[in-house]
């Protein structure tokens, strides 16, 4: 398939709807100047059209393969993901203290919009990683942030969200998985997870060195 990015429309939406110019007036997002924003929006459009869109059909025809417990992606996916990471697209809005660029999340949304329009199945990989980064940045302990964020932000590791259960699909509120705090012993302060999760998007693949699974569970 071919993909033609709607760069000018996206720039208009980012300026008018997302208020990027107002964000850039703050100290936190001062780097989000017009020239940089245009370079990001134009650059990711070209990248999505040139590297991810052509793999849409490849993914349909070849598909992923599971052999001896190892999931292998079709030809071209590993190189495209490596280029995505090398060019810094995964780190656009990642916290600067963990190797990210610290830019407004609006720009990460634009990256994901372009990648998703070009190849939605492939785009779910970075989308889930960005979600894991956001969750850990806002809710993770300092220890968890130090352990996981640098490699998630760099793209060396990827992330997932473990929500779906046999009886809880779109009705996430029906989940039964529980998390019980361990109070004693060598694992004190951690949680014992009990339950079953299924249909974990990008739950196994060969593109990242490690996959971090965020599990949704109920506390007692």
Where do the model's predicted regions map?
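Core alpha/beta catalytic barrel or barrel-like domain that forms the active/cofactor pocket
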Residues: 91-96, 118-133, 155-165
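Short, flexible loop/turn elements at secondary-structure junctions
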Residues: 98, 165-167, 183, 197, ...
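Amphipathic, small/basic residue-rich leader segments at the start of a protein or domain
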Residues: 1-123, 147
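A short core secondary-structure module
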Residues: 189-220
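Short helix/loop capping segments that flank catalytic or ligand/cofactor-binding pockets
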Residues: 93, 101-104, 170-172, 201-203, ...
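Internal maturation/activation junctions in enzymes
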Residues: 129, 140-182, 186
């Amino acid at each position: 398939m071919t993909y033609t990015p709607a760069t000018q429309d996206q720039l208009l939406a980012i300026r008018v709807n997302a208020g990027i110019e107002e964000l850039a007036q703050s100290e936190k997002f001062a780097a989000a100047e017009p020239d940089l924003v245009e370079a990001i929006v134009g650059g990711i459009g070209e990248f999505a059209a040139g590297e991810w869109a052509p793999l849409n059909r490849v993914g349909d025809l070849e598909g992923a393969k599971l052999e001896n417990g190892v999931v292998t992606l079709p030809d071209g996916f590993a190189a495209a993901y490596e280029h995505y990471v090398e060019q810094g697209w995964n780190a656009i809005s990642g916290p600067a203290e963990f190797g990210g660029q610290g830019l407004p999340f609006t720009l990460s949304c634009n990256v994901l919009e372009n990648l998703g329009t070009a190849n939605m199945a492939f785009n779910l990989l970075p989308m889930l990683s960005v979600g894991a980064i956001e969750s850990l940045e806002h809710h993770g302990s300092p220890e968890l942030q130090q352990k996981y964020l640098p490699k998630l932000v760099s793209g060396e590791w990827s992330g997932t969200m473990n929500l779906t259960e046999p009886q809880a699909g779109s009705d996430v509120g029906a989940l039964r998985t529980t998390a019980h705090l361990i109070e004693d012993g060598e694992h004190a302060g951690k949680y014992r997870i009990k339950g079953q999760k299924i249909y974990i998007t990008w739950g196994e693949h060969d593109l990242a060195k490690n996959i971090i699974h965020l599990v949704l569970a109920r506390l007692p």
